[in-house]
């Protein structure tokens, strides 16, 4: 039976030798349709006298091969129209194959003849005509399977051997992950007659002193159905747990009563001793089935035998893999939602203390603190001194007087059983330094959820615990890759924004502290998509590039309505060059955060109450009244904002002081404003301790729950205790 090789888009893009392609593309089915600019033939099968397209498939490429490397090689043949290395749609890693398109077919024929099996980055490439029609690729006509190949035979040697029987479309020797030959390969001829001719002349011949088998390739589907039929009609029986004293004659007589035996053998080692298992092959399936049913689990010479159908190695490995996968899934579903991960533990917390901490929240099935098992227990000075004394005693001469003195000094203090118990207790004690994390498993998801709610961020021995549901390593890795990819995307968008390039999508809103770089909190509720850093969010109902309703600089406005609002620190943190008249960012919206209203005025020229006067603002410093009379920095005249200014509004900026944030005001505020209020309360405290990282650390802390943030605002030194954690996260 022919062996199987994983199929890939590379194989499907060439011809019927689907099983003769590399395996990397199986992880990225989304990248299976490369862009090939050349025109393809639509004939049922390529013939020798028909012109090919100018598109070539290049396989067996190293993952580091790029389009530039291929262009340097293939441009020596003729003018190259395009080159594309096919990559995974998600990771953008090379799938190991590419397409090279020439402007004319003659150059493609020369490249196929001259460059096939050329070394690229130390690996011989495999070149063939591209065939995009899947029906033509999967016909299998002319596909030949060769097995029992010598390990020295590579793709080129196999091609040279079988090229005498006809035009070869594809030729490949299967290799493992280390590049070693698996002992079989495939040759796809252009016609079925050439394939039959190769089978007739090469099958049973010697290649490098090894007799090879050459036959028509059987598809995986047909092989699978044939394999199932063979399993249902097995004749070969495997027996294990045999006594080592059983010889070949006795072994054969044990199974002769079930039917005619064609062969029976015991496996022996190099010394000729039985290895405890053997094989019996019957002439009929019924005899083999009867032997399995009667002899399985039967005791012979005090050993229970195992008798079953003989399996090949790959079949046993596949069965074990399925059993392991089923056990893993069962275990994962069993502990789904009940297993907790606890980190930031102090060194003095062991398994018992961890169980005591989480015991009040439910029934704990297991609790374990992970420790470094490679660290051996250090010997105490007392034990070291006792060992030295024992060594000195052992150095004494064993005289009769000394033996009598030792017997006289012996006391019936402890029995050997008590000593054994103490030794067992000492062995059970955990050794090695704590890794600072552990796991707690509850009996129900409700108990685990309650423990997460109550114990997360709780201070234990001066350190806040981190408690969350335990996740598998592959899940954590995928989440980490997703977060890294999102972070890289944000950096790319920021770089593009700095260069003035258009953005494909907008980024989360940024909280700006006074004179600080902004940080990026989570997305706000109600936002269709978050705005760019350095920008502020638009109000629902506004058109892109404009503020909702009339505003200075827009047409058709007589001032803002009474329900239109603007934040108190609106102008702070906006980069230079992005402000329009009045300090407003050009073409950008603003969030509804501060409850400050405009008064109705002509032309909408009113000063925004509670908004700091920016340089160059209408009515602000540097912008004079009437003919531009100068106003000193920090001064403000009554009525300076124009006719639309609200007389009852305060002239200075309004700030949310830390003392003004309490649970009542926080609960009354909308969710989008709560984080802003807490950030404004925490920012001054953190800025006093970390001026350079104040904005970033504040952003990190705002990822915590609002109740915890509220408690931090009430404690003057609370941010100091959180500083190491936030500082670590920020770096």
From Swiss-Prot:
Chief location of this protein within or outside the cell: cytoplasm
Keyword hit for RNA-binding: yes
Ranges of biased composition (kind: Polar residues): 1-10
Gene Ontology biological process: mRNA processing; mRNA transport; regulation of translation
Pfam families in alphabetical order: MLLE, RRM_1
Cellular component per GO, a single term: nucleus
Region called Disordered, residue ranges: 1-51, 369-429, 603-665
Gene Ontology terms, MF aspect: RNA binding
CDD domains: RRM1_I_PABPs, RRM2_I_PABPs, RRM3_I_PABPs, RRM4_I_PABPs
UniProt xrefs under InterPro entries: Nucleotide-bd_a/b_plait_sf, PABP-dom, PABP_1234, PABP_HYD_C, PABP_RRM1, RBD_domain_sf, RRM2_I_PABPs, RRM_dom
Domain RRM, first and last residues per copy: 54-132, 142-219, 235-312, 338-472
Low complexity bias (residue ranges): 17-39, 645-656
Cellular location(s): Cytoplasm; Nucleus
Residue span(s) of domain PABC: 658-731
Keywords, sorted A to Z: Cytoplasm, mRNA processing, mRNA transport, Nucleus, Repeat, RNA-binding, Translation regulation, Transport
Composition bias, Gly residues: 616-627
PROSITE patterns the UniProt entry points to: PABC, RRM
Entry similarity comment: Belongs to the polyadenylate-binding protein type-1 family.
Biological function: Binds the poly(A) tail of mRNA. Appears to be an important mediator of the multiple roles of the poly(A) tail in mRNA biogenesis, stability and translation. In the nucleus, involved in both mRNA cleavage and polyadenylation. Is also required for efficient mRNA export to the cytoplasm. Acts in concert with a poly(A)-specific nuclease (PAN) to affect poly(A) tail shortening, which may occur concomitantly with either nucleocytoplasmic mRNA transport or translational initiation.
Protein name per Swiss-Prot or TrEMBL: Polyadenylate-binding protein, cytoplasmic and nuclear
UniProt lineage: Eukaryota, Fungi, Dikarya, Ascomycota, Pezizomycotina
Name of the coding gene: pab1
């Amino acid at each position: 039976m022919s062996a199987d090789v994983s199929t890939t888009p590379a194989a499907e893009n060439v011809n019927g030798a689907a099983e003769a392609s590399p395996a990397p593309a199986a992880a990225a089915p989304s990248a299976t349709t490369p862009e090939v600019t050349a025109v393809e033939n639509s004939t049922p099968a390529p013939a020798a006298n028909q012109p090919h397209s100018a598109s070539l498939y290049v396989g067996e490429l190293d993952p580091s091969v790029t389009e530039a490397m291929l262009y340097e090689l293939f441009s020596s043949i003729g003018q190259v129209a395009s080159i594309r290395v096919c990559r995974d749609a998600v990771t953008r890693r090379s799938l190991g194959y590419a397409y090279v398109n020439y402007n004319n077919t003659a150059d493609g024929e020369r490249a196929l003849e001259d460059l096939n099996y050329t070394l690229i980055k130390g690996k011989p490439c495999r070149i063939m005509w591209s065939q995009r029609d899947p029906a033509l690729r999967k016909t299998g006509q002319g596909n030949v399977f060769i097995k029992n190949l010598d390990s020295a035979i590579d793709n080129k040697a196999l091609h040279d051997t079988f090229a005498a029987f006809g035009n070869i479309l594809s030729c490949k020797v299967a290799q493992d992950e280390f590049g070693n030959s698996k002992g079989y390969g495939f040759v796809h001829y252009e016609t079925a007659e050439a394939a039959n001719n190769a089978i007739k002349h090469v099958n049973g011949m010697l290649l490098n002193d090894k007799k090879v088998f050459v036959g028509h390739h059987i598809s995986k589907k047909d092989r699978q159905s044939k394999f199932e039929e063979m399993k249902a009609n097995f004749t070969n029986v495997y027996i294990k747990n045999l006594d080592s004293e059983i010889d070949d004659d006795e072994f054969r007589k044990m199974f002769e009563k079930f039917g005619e035996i064609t062969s029976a053998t015991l496996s022996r080692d190099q010394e000729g001793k039985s290895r405890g298992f053997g094989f019996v092959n019957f002439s009929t399936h019924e005899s083999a089935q009867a032997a399995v049913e009667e002899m399985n689990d039967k005791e012979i010479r005090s050993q229970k035998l195992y008798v079953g159908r003989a399996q090949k190695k790959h079949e046993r490995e596949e069965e074990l893999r399925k059993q392991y996968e089923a056990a893993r899934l069962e275990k994962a579903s069993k502990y789904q939602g009940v297993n907790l991960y606890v980190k930031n533990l102090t060194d003095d917390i062991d398994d018992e203390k961890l169980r005591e901490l989480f015991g009040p929240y439910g029934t704990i099935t297991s609790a374990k603190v992970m420790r470094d098992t490679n660290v051996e227990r250090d010997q105490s000075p007392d034990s070291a001194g006792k060992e030295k004394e024992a060594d000195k005693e052992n150095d004494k001469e064993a005289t009769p007087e000394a033996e009598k003195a030792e017997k006289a000094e012996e006391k019936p203090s402890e029995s050997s059983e008590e000593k054994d118990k103490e030794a067992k207790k000492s062995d059970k004690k955990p050794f090695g330094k704590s890794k600072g994390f552990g796991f707690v498993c509850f009996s129900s998801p409700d108990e685990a959820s309650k423990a997460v709610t109550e114990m997360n961020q709780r201070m234990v021995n001066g350190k806040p615990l981190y408690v969350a549901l335990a996740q598998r390593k592959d899940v954590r890795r995928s989440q980490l890759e997703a977060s890294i990819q999102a972070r890289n995307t944000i950096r790319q968008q920021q770089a593009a924004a700095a260069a003035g390039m258009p953005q494909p999508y907008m980024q989360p809103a940024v909280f700006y502290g006074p004179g600080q770089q902004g940080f990026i909190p989570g997305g706000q509720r109600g936002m269709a998509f978050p705005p760019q850093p350095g920008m502020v969010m638009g109000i629902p109902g506004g058109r892109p590039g404009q503020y909702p309703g009339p505003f200075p600089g827009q047409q058709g406005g007589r001032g803002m309505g009474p329900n239109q609002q603007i934040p108190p620190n609106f102008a702070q943190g906006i980069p230079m060059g992005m402000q329009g008249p009045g300090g407003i960012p050009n073409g950008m919206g603003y969030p509804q955060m501060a409850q400050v209203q405009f008064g109705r005025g002509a032309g909408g020229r009113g000063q925004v109450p509670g908004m700091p006067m920016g340089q160059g603002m209408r009515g602000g410093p540097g912008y004079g009244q009437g003919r531009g009379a100068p106003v000193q920095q920090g001064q403000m005249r009554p009525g300076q904002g124009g006719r639309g200014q609200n007389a009852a509004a305060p002239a200075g900026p309004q700030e949310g002081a830390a003392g003004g944030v309490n649970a009542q005001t926080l609960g009354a505020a909308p969710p989008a404003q709560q984080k802003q209020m807490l950030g404004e309360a925490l920012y001054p405290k953190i800025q006093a301790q970390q001026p350079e990282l104040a904005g970033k650390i504040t952003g990190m802390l705002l990822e915590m729950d609002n109740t915890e943030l509220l408690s931090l605002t009430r404690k003057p030194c609370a941010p100091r205790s959180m500083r190491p954690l936030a500082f670590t996260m920020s770096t």
